[in-house]
């Protein structure tokens, strides 16, 4: 029953893109469809059921295409320097700027976070399958990984901004709390200057990938 429900939901999602309506055109629609397919992919690829996994692997390429579409509408914080040496200055500088509209920032950050989380998941899945570590497809897999991570994917590490419940809370956190612009998995500056209280759920997941689960817990506890 669960398998049928998932299969039907995915088919409904894909039919909206291939039907006569022309598919998603607005940025919010592109974000919604990508997040929906991403969640279905997590279920199908990690469930352990052979049929679900085969269906999920069939749609990996489609998820990548939709992620590329999201990259085209993403505000990638290009005004900030990518090097870690400029991160502290940029954080202070941004706090001195007038904060963006709360709803606008939430949408833009959702796009940025969806992109880096989905790409990270797809790479992790390939690693779990053994690609890139001696299999016959290792060269192709490594080329794909370089293609994804050759691009700069920036996102904002700040629990205070991400968990703000109102425009007032957001503006106050923007002015009073540090927020760190992370490029891909470049956490060095944050680990030197950030605090455990800055870490939200996504940041904890990505930090765990970067430095290990226990090390991340220790950092959050020690620097809170």
What are the residue ranges of the model-derived segments?
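C-terminal effector modules of eukaryotic transcription factors
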Residues: 2-10, 51-224
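C-terminal transcriptional activation/regulatory domains of eukaryotic transcription factors
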Residues: 1-48
């Amino acid at each position: 029953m669960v398998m049928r429900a998932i299969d039907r939901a995915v088919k409904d999602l894909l039919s909206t893109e291939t039907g006569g309506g022309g598919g998603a055109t607005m940025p919010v629609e592109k974000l919604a469809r990508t997040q929906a397919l991403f969640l279905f992919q997590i279920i199908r690829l990690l469930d352990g059921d052979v049929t679900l996994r085969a269906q999920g692997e069939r749609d990996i390429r489609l998820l990548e295409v939709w992620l590329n579409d999201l990259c085209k509408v993403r505000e990638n914080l290009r005004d900030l320097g990518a090097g870690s040496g400029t991160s502290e200055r940029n954080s202070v500088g941004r706090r001195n700027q007038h904060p963006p509209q709360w709803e606008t920032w939430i949408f833009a950050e959702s796009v940025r976070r969806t992109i880096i989380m989905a790409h990270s998941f797809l790479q992790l899945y390939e690693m779990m399958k053994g690609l890139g570590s001696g299999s016959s497809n290792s060269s192709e897999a490594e080329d794909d990984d370089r293609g994804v991570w050759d691009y700069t994917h920036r996102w904002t590490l700040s629990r205070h901004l991400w968990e703000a419940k109102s425009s007032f809370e957001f503006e106050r956190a923007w002015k009073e709390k540090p927020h760190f612009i992370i490029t891909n998995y470049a956490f060095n500056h944050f680990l030197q200057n950030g605090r455990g209280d800055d870490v939200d759920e996504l940041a904890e997941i990505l930090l765990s990938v970067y430095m290990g689960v226990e090390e991340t817990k220790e950092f959050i506890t020690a620097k809170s």
